[in-house]
Amino acid sequence: MDDFLKERLVKYDTWLDRGQISFSSKIIPTRESLSAQQWVLPSEQVLDILCNAQSIAVQKCGCRVHFSRCNKPLEVCFLLNKTGEHAIGKGQARSVSLPEAADIVRKADEYGLIHLTLYRRDHEIYALCNCCPCCCHDLQLMKIYNRQDLVVRSEYVAVTDKDLCINCGKCVERCIFDARTFDDSQLLYNSGLCLGCGLCVTVCPARATVMELRDP
């Protein structure tokens, strides 16, 4: 395991053993994927999280800087409140307004990045990251090292109307959680593997997939 991941995992496991956290991060659906919903949980809206922050800073994604495995945008990770102010003071981040933050979120959506909220030991959200599976420490720990306990799924799940689906495969390419596969040119979807990021919704040309609240 890479030292970068090992250091992060040791920190998480220490906090878990002490009962200081129950998970490290949580999936937040993309804004566009929830646009058809008449009512959306406030905690599931990226902009609501940013609006409720006293201050917002943005910095380059530490994971993509470290691993350099893709050409996705770098300056897309938000630090909130005191965490952001501390990073600004050290020259590691810059302050951004809410409109600029919204533009960064839209850019992240376009590049297929996954919104992850990161939590302190006191359960406060201190960062909202826009993550790629090839570099993100939490997504790597979950997918490669089988630590599903670290990343919590969103309260939403993708639902696909088979009658509307044209089996184009774009959602299969988009899904990083292996919830969607092809068999004899037919889409197979395992909703149990869906973590509710919403990326499949925004890429569907037939609008066959929508996000719905999960069953309790």
Question: Where do the protein language model's features map onto the residues?
Answer:
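General detector of N-terminal leader/presequence modules that precede the first folded domain
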Residues: 1-86
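Ferredoxin-type iron-sulfur electron-transfer modules and their immediate structural context
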Residues: 48, 56-164
